[in-house]
């Protein structure tokens, strides 16, 4: 087997590493750098530039120089975060025919995976130049909180670049691999990996167990924000500088793409300098001009000013830390080491906040720019057999399930479940003689199905005619080692099966994901009341169905007065079943039960007489049938 390279496909910078002589090695690109800017430029003569060459010409070609593409991968054009990027990016973001966020480069529509593939090609070429052989396989990292669509899009990007992606690995987990293999400590250690990169933020709690030289890396929990990173820090500083210039010169730089591109580079440079010094000057001669002549920018920025601008962003990373610890059933005192990953963690304010939260200093012996690529190379070495005695156990970041009766999400796989994993559950039909069901797949933490992320749906038809609750539909969720979901539904009676790999058309933005978990906690009482309401509605629906059936079968065996009272109670219950008042529904249920005594007696007598015929149709061999709300698909032939 050939080399499997490890690639950190970053928002701001990318990096490639290999295993050489049982040790990971970060490779230098053709410019002699160990990291490559994740920037792609399309020149007027049709040339495609990647990395530093693309960055150097960005000032003169801002509309065709693409950066931070990772923020768009697997996302919808109408996403709030994408719309924000539409307004601030110098290049053109458009809506694809299917609603995805794409790019317009010189009139040509391009998908984010297609653009990201250019960076992967550069990483592939870097490895090939060093090794002197063709490379066709890679392990690529993604943020831990990337959803299924974003992972799929990353794999697509690898395929476009001519790489078979052997594994998608979470960035904090990769960093833990790099850290863990480099340490000679024995026994269990629990580490927190705080990963604040150019466009995304992740926190993972990972246990490293070393027994007789064999190391197991088990992810206990993960959390994060897929649209928060260094680019957001840069934007705040850019806006501050542009606003200060406008106050001083009364000129709006926002309308000048060339000026804004220069300002972006200067802001990024100033931010980096302020990690080492307490003040810096942003000097941009001839940034613009008006009828009085050329204008120059000269603004002094202090570290204190920068920290005041970005403090809210840093504070936004604190809540996921609390959730991750809670999900892992740990406290701060259980954390042995804190690892910082991502270039933005070089900011003193970030280090200070993380140190205060965990009550210990972060490790200084892990390179935040290279650790993720090294970990990816280690995983590649494990897959190829070059690295022995390493076992990696990762998790899925959000719960997965389907919509069931009453609009409830029934979870099949809970968040932070170790992957790969597989789980099956038996469901049934909601109507008599229902010939087809629709499986609606959801991702999230809320009880109400509509409050979660819809990943897609598919149909299973050809179900044999039967009373509701009799057919047995086995729904299976299977998450592979890349965290990608495969769903199947099988009619156990006929053996008919339908399966799909979920390929959601849109990514989960940070607001959606964080809201799912936070709202589930903040609105626990609301969710509990909703569950109770659904349960009472389902009870009412079952009672309506069984009472109507009994009326049809033995209604002639009771008095007209009893029959009239039952029909009246049925109408009253039907009139309130859709209301939000649980007590009113419960009251009408009791009223119907009260007037249905004679009908129940007649039905029991009828059942005793026909017991031998009805026993087959009412048996439930598994005893674990869950009513599910499936829509019937009409035959349109």
UniProtKB/Swiss-Prot annotation:
Region (Disordered): 600-637
Keywords: ATP-binding, Chaperone, Nucleotide-binding, Phosphoprotein, Stress response
Pfam family membership, one: HSP70
Cited PROSITE patterns: HSP70_1, HSP70_2, HSP70_3
Bias (Low complexity) ranges: 610-619
Residues with the Phosphothreonine modification: 200
HAMAP family: DnaK
Family of this protein: Belongs to the heat shock protein 70 family.
Protein name: Chaperone protein DnaK
Organism, scientific name: Blochmanniella pennsylvanica (strain BPEN)
């Amino acid at each position: 087997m050939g080399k499997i390279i490890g690639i950190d496909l970053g928002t701001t910078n990318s990096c490639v590493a290999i295993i050489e002589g049982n040790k990971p090695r970060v490779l230098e690109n053709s410019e002699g750098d160990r990291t490559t800017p994740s920037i792609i430029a399309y020149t007027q003569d049709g040339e495609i530039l990647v990395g530093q060459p693309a960055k150097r010409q960005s000032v003169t070609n801002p509309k065709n120089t693409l950066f931070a593409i990772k923020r768009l991968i697997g996302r919808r054009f109408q996403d709030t975060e994408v719309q924000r990027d539409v307004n601030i990016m110098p290049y053109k973001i458009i809506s694809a025919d299917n609603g995805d966020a794409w790019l317009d480069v010189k009139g040509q529509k391009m998908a984010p995976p297609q653009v990201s593939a250019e960076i992967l090609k550069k990483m592939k070429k870097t490895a090939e130049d060093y090794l002197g052989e063709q490379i066709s396989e890679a392990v690529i990292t993604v943020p831990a909180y990337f959803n299924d669509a974003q992972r799929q899009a990353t794999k697509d990007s690898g395929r476009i670049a001519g790489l078979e992606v052997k594994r998608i690995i979470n960035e904090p987990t990769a960093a833990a691999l790099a850290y863990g293999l480099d340490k000679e400590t024995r026994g269990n250690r629990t580490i927190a990996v705080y990963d604040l990169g150019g466009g995304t933020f992740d926190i993972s709690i990972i246990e490293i167990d070393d027994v007789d030289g064999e190391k197991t890396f088990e992810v206990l929990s993960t959390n994060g924000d897929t649209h928060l990173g260094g680019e957001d820090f840069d934007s705040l500083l850019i806006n501050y500088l542009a606003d200060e210039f406008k106050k001083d010169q009364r000129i709006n730089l926002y309308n000048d793409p060339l000026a804004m591109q220069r300002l972006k580079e200067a802001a990024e440079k100033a931010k980096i300098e302020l990690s080492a010094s307490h003040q810096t000057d942003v000097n941009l001669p001839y940034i613009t001009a008006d009828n009085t002549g050329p204008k120059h920018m000269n603004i002094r920025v202090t570290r204190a000013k920068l920290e005041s601008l970005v403090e809210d962003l840093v504070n936004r990373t604190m809540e996921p830390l609390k959730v991750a610890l809670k999900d892992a059933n740990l406290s701060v005192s259980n954390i042995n080491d804190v690892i910082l990953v991502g270039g933005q963690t070089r900011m003193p304010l970030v280090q200070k906040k993380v140190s205060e939260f965990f009550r210990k200093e972060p490790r200084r012996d892990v390179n935040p720019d290279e650790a993720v690529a090294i970990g990816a190379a280690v995983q590649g070495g494990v897959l190829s057999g070059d690295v022995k005695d390493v076992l990696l156990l990762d998790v899925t970041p959000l719960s997965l399930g389907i919509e069931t009766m009453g609009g409830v999400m029934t979870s099949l796989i809970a968040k932070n479940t170790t992957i790969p994993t597989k789980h099956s559950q038996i469901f049934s039909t909601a109507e008599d003689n229902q010939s087809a069901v629709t499986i609606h797949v959801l991702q999230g933490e809320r009880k109400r199905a509509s409050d979660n992320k819809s990943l897609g749906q598919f149909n299973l038809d050809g179900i044999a005619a039967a009373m509701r609750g009799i057919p047995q539909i086995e729904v299976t969720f299977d998450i592979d080692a890349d965290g990608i979901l495969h769903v199947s539904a099988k009619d156990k009676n006929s053996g008919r099966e339908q399966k799909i790999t979920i390929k959601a058309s849109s990514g989960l933005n940070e607001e959606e994901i964080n809201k799912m978990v936070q709202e589930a906690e903040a609105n626990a009482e609301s969710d509990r009341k909703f569950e109770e309401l659904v349960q009472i509605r389902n009870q009412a629906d079952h009672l309506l169905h069984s009472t109507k059936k009994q009326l049809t079968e033995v209604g002639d065996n009771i008095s007209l007065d009893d029959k009239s009272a039952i029909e009246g109670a049925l109408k009253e219950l039907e009139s309130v079943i859709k209301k939000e008042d649980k007590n009113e529904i419960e009251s009408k249920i009791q009223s119907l039960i009260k007037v249905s005594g004679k009908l129940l007696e007649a039905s029991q007598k009828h059942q005793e007489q026909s017991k031998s015929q009805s026993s087959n149709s009412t048996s439930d061999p598994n005893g674990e049938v869950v009513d599910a709300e499936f829509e019937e698909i009409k035959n349109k032939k």
